[in-house]
Amino acid sequence: MKTLRWGIVGTGGIANSMAGMIEMADASEIAAVSSRRMETAQRYAKKHGVPNAFDSWQEMIDSDVVDAIYVATPTSVREEICIAAARGGKHVLGEKPFASLPSVQRITAACRDNGVAFMDGTHFVHHPRTLDIKQHRADRLGFVWSVASAFQFNLGDRGNIRFNPELEPMGAIGDAGWYNMRAAVE
């Protein structure tokens, strides 16, 4: 089996968490990382044993060192990077949330048109237990008329990107609320 060489765009908290997940996966390795600042990319690369660091996501996509891109950036720039990766022949794993339905449709069209895979980063929908829950609902509950849901986490300081509407147009509700909304429609 060929090893899938990942490039990670972004070096924040979720990108650090994802590094361990990629390394634990069979036939996967992190081959490159990009950040707006080279020193940040190099620090991430050193921490996670990544051989290539870039200060431009476009240069990383254009390189031949990666087969797939994990996009862990603010929502405001995610679509552009996902589409560029697809056009560059790279498979795309885009972190959630996405800006809008039309945005996701453009990303999936770019992936389809370029023969690459697309997945969103809502981890639980790709987990086998989600299929079990759906089957249980179908077998025992039938149509669900109402859903009550809660999700919380510590946002940390006010420097968190979720407080910046230019970077995260939907703010914390787009990030945390995404889980609740996705669970309801799944």
Please annotate each region the language model reported.
Residues 68, 74-75, 79-123:
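Beta-strand-loop-alpha-helix segment that lines the small-molecule cofactor/substrate pocket
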Residues 50-57:
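Conserved SAM-binding strand-loop segment of SAM-dependent methyltransferases
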Residues 2-4, 116, 142-145:
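Nucleotide donor/acceptor-binding cores
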Residues 1-48:
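N-terminal Rossmann-like dinucleotide-binding module
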Residues 124-186:
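Predominantly a Rossmann-like dinucleotide-binding segment in NAD(P)-dependent oxidoreductases
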Residues 32, 52, 68, 146:
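Short, Asp-centered acidic motifs that coordinate Mg2+ and/or phosphate
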